[in-house]
């Protein structure tokens, strides 16, 4: 998900997306621990998406 797409979301939608990504990250880490994870790059992508969402939320918080 690109930052441009995240900016267009409402705060509630951003928080929901963040929650979804955190759940996905948990599941990916579990798969990695059990040796079932095939696409290891997905871990990095999910972490970066969480960081992007948190960054946009913080920017909005500071602008208010």
Swiss-Prot record:
Gene3D superfamilies from the UniProt entry: 1.10.287.310
Family: Belongs to the universal ribosomal protein uL29 family.
Pfam family, one: Ribosomal_L29
SUPFAM superfamilies the record matches: Ribosomal protein L29 (L29p) (SSF46561)
Keywords of this entry: Ribonucleoprotein, Ribosomal protein
Cited NCBIfam families: L29
One of the protein's GO biological processes: translation
Highest taxon, organism lineage: Bacteria
Residues annotated as transmembrane: none
Source organism: Latilactobacillus sakei subsp. sakei (strain 23K) (Lactobacillus sakei subsp. sakei)
A GO molecular-function descriptor: structural constituent of ribosome
Protein name according to UniProt: Large ribosomal subunit protein uL29
Name of the encoding gene: rpmC
One annotated Gene Ontology cellular component of this protein: cytosolic large ribosomal subunit
